[in-house]
Regions:
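Cleft-lining beta-strand/loop regions that shape enzyme active-site pockets
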Residues: 1-122, 157-165, 171-179
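Generic signature of intrinsically disordered, low-complexity segments enriched in small/polar residues
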Residues: 9-12, 135, 152, 183
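A sequence-level detector of short, solvent-exposed, charge-rich linear segments
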Residues: 58-62, 112, 120, 145, ...
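A short pocket-lining beta-strand/turn micro-motif at the edge of beta-sheets
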Residues: 97, 120-124, 136, 145-147
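Active-site rim recognition segments
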Residues: 132-156
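Conserved functional hotspot residues or short segments at active or partner-binding sites
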Residues: 140, 156-160, 164, 170-199
Length: 199
């Protein structure tokens, strides 16, 4: 979860995601990094207006935003090998109710670290920042993100090319897309002249 992968995510969100109804973000086997807040800027940006360009449909101009944004449904996949920033991301998606999380609880290895070289002895890493859940105050260290849908792979499934967690994520995403597409839309009311109303 570094800036190179973040910029690739932002680019592919529209190059690959264009016209799609939802996306699955897979942070399984992800060792972490530092891009959760950048990802959340894309995925949780509040909407304050609807725009309609001449001859076009409803939307909002992407060039007005810090990053391209995604408001359609998402599902996050995580597992026991999701660490650090991948866990913070999974916790955030669940806490903010931005999407559903599928997989197994993450490792519970959430702590910012730094380090120093030790003369003739290598490198010593030291924790310097703890991470706590908003609302409950629970320490994310030793408390992994718990998915909405817990599903452990059975022995032999992954080597055989069967990914039951991904299948579950697809099933959940389809339900979320259906709910999203059926949500009420505000009626757009065109401006009327105040002079006409006074007559």
């Amino acid at each position: 979860m570094n800036m190179t992968s973040f910029f690739r995510f932002e680019e592919e969100l529209y190059s690959v995601g264009a016209g799609k109804d939802g996306i699955i973000i897979d942070v399984r086997e992800n060792g972490g990094g530092s891009t959760t807040d950048h990802l959340l800027t894309i995925l949780t940006q509040p909407r304050h207006a609807i725009t309609v360009p001449r001859g076009g449909g409803r939307g909002y101009p992407q060039d007005r935003k810090v990053y391209a944004s995604w408001h359609k449904p998402i599902v996050v996949l995580c597992n026991q090998n999701s660490y650090s920033n991948a866990e913070i991301f999974s916790h955030a998606i669940k806490h903010l109710k931005r999407g559903k999380v599928v997989g197994v609880p993450t490792a519970g290895g959430v702590i910012s670290t730094g380090g120093r070289s030790i003369m003739d002895m290598g490198y010593l890493r030291m924790p310097f920042r703890g991470w706590y859940l908003m609302g409950t105050g629970e320490d994310m260290e030793l408390n992994g993100a718990v998915p909405h849908y817990i599903l452990w792979p059975k022995p032999g499934e992954l080597p055989a090319g069967r990914d039951t967690q991904l299948r579950k994520a697809i099933s959940v995403l389809k339900k979320e897309v259906k709910k999203y597409n059926n949500r009420p839309q505000p009626e757009l009311k065109n401006a009327t002249s105040k002079l006409k109303e006074k007559k």
